[in-house]
Amino acid sequence: MRYRSDRVKIAIDVMGGDRAPDEILKGALLASKEVEGEIVLIGPEEIVRNKGLPFVSAFEIVKMDDPPLEVLRKKNSSMHVGLKLLSEGKVDAFVSAGATGPLFLGATSIVGKLEGIERPALGVAVPSLKGATVLIDAGANAKVRPEHLVDFAFMGIAYSKVLGAENPRVGLLNMGSEENKGPDDIKRAYQLLKEFLGDTFFGNIEGHDINLGTVDVVVADGFSGNVALKTMEGTAKLVTSVLKESIKDGGFLSLLGALLMKRSFDKMKEKLDPRSYGGTFILGVKGIVVKAHGSSDAKAIKHAIKVAEKGIRMNIVQEIERGISHVRNSGDGR
């Protein structure tokens, strides 16, 4: 796997997200201190100028409640301009906390789909006991055909290899581990994954397996994947909140113990904090597009930009192209 070591250029949609533009600008400034390259601000000139970072003016806004087609209609919006810059090779990646529908449509229409990919998908690396598990689709395609789930598996395998997995194993998210569980489309997807992936396919997995690291890649339709992701985010917040309350209510000894274990607690909190893995790749398009959570604060935006940088340096688009081409042409598991 080739690693890019040169300076990168990442564009950020300053007007995308519930907390735009203030938190987006703060996050971009934080990221600029850690990323080896340029962060390019895209938004209305009166908002993005004099921030100490390069900028591109875009006076229109794709709002969070806008229908998907608005990204194509509003050609002077920060989202459209950013995707256009990416498609023209003027930036290496584009990050937005804007609405998923417009961003996804814009990525597939303006940046374009990779050859052989009918449905791009959202892929996110979530924390697990064994490091990270790739969840795909995390919310782009509510309804899919079984064949689309096979494409998701190929893309997820490539992403998992970028994260360091040597021989990623794939699981199909279902309501039970038995082969005959689930609706007909899931049963059909099971058979296709078994046929195309061979021993790489682990079989059905359940929601609790995602964070246990039972497999390296979890394949799901966008509805189920998004529910799983949001549930994990809520659980992470619950765990940290309960831990804080327990320490607070436990008296002096609990506080003393917490002080002695502060470094361990901080590491746990960082790993569980959804903001720490705050970016989701739109996989299957010809450029690196990262979707940040709509409610992202500065910390989450910083991490989303760093996710984009990692995707650039690990050549994730080329790895997906190579992985899909190799698996499909080799005949392995067919």
Swiss-Prot record:
It catalyses: a fatty acyl-[ACP] + phosphate = an acyl phosphate + holo-[ACP]. The keyword RNA-binding does not apply. One of its GO terms (cellular component) is cytoplasm. Its EC number is 2.3.1.274. Pfam families: FA_synthesis. GO terms for molecular function: phosphate:acyl-[acyl carrier protein] acyltransferase activity. Keywords: Cytoplasm, Lipid biosynthesis, Lipid metabolism, Phospholipid biosynthesis, Phospholipid metabolism, Transferase. HAMAP family: PlsX. Catalyzes the reversible formation of acyl-phosphate (acyl-PO(4)) from acyl-[acyl-carrier-protein] (acyl-ACP). This enzyme utilizes acyl-ACP as fatty acyl donor, but not acyl-CoA. Belongs to the PlsX family. Homodimer. Probably interacts with PlsY. This is Phosphate acyltransferase.
